Design a protein with these regions (language model features):
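Bacterial N-terminal signal peptides that target proteins for export
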Residues: 1-9
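C-terminal region of N-terminal signal peptides and the immediate post-cleavage residues
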Residues: 8, 15-32
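Alpha-helical segments in soluble extracytoplasmic regions
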Residues: 29-119, 129-163
Length: 164
């Protein structure tokens, strides 16, 4: 009986070790993660360039209808950015970077929220509030970049030019 118990314990321990190493092999490396998310970010960057075409001119226009159109463009860009963020969240993350990436996703959510508020302010014709929201978008983008700088993103790196 004692020999059988030892064999069972040894077998269980070996299976746990194998399961642990198999799980570790499933975790992508940081470079593999970047390779998986960059195409998503690239598609979103290109979509936002199309959505936000001429938005700066419209937002600074004296015509209220042009300002409202700019607001609609920012709201649409916010929705596209949110969809891209959701896609990014589904990509398997390296276990070592999980906490950092969760903070990055939180920062990206704030960018999305601020883009939406910027669009709402422009649609309401409140240019001063819109200017404040634009600064908040830039600050949130910088915060997201500060969290994700170790990944050396290209398309996932946010800049003011992404949203103007």
């Amino acid at each position: 009986m004692r020999g059988t118990l030892r064999i069972a314990v040894f077998t269980a321990a070996a299976m746990l070790l194998l399961a642990g190493s198999a799980r570790a092999d499933d975790d992508p490396t940081r470079a593999e993660y970047v390779e998986q998310v960059e195409p998503i970010c690239q598609a979103n960057t290109e979509a936002n360039q199309r959505i936000l075409k001429n938005v700066k001119t419209k937002a600074r226009s004296k015509s209220p209808s042009q300002v409202r159109k700019a607001g609609s463009q920012f709201i649409q860009a916010s929705a596209a950015f949110g969809a891209a963020t959701q896609k990014l969240a589904t990509v398997p993350r390296p276990a070592a970077d999980d906490t950092r990436l969760l903070r990055w996703f939180k920062s990206l959510g704030i960018v999305k929220e601020k883009l939406f508020k910027l669009g709402k302010a422009l649609k309401a014709g409140e240019k001063i509030l819109a200017a404040h929201e634009q600064v908040r978008v830039e600050r949130a983008s910088n915060a997201a970049n500060n969290v994700g700088f170790v990944f050396e993103f290209h398309y996932c790196h946010l800049s003011a030019s992404n949203f103007t």
